[in-house]
Amino acid sequence: MAVLSTNNATLTILVANALPIKVENFDPNSDMWSVDDLQTADGEVTPDGQFNHWAINGAIQCTLNLSGGSKTSKKLEFLLNNQQRVGQSLSYIPEVSVVVTLNGETETYVGGILKQGKAGRSLGYPKINPTAWVFLFPRKV
């Protein structure tokens, strides 16, 4: 499920110490969930050529596209704005997980952070601008 462009899927965002957020009101003009290729893998090979295992390197970056009027978008904006700072660095970032379910298949992204929310092009009225929410995850279960 690298890219979802259907509204038949169910997305749930789990934030540390908070109730789950059921995602609604996707941006109809873009993919609702996409996984970017920030993940690489290397194989461990011994000097005699024996292959042992794959190791995953890097983070998984996922983008969630919501319409501007989405209640989920407002909750994510609140979450992003309330990350605590000490000087220029973040001191508290709540851990997030995202569960994606489509046709009985479930993918779970755990141990991530909400990185940013990027507003889309202005349509003349800011409340209807779509927003792309970017998450970073170390792994997918």
What are these regions (language model features)?
Residues I60-V86:
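Charged, amphipathic alpha-helical segments
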Residues P138-K140:
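Hydrophobic lipid-interacting interfaces of membrane-associated proteins
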Residues M1-G69, E105-V134:
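Solvent-exposed edge beta-strands and adjacent loop segments
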Residues F78-T108:
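Short, acidic/charged, Gly/Pro-enriched secondary-structure junctions
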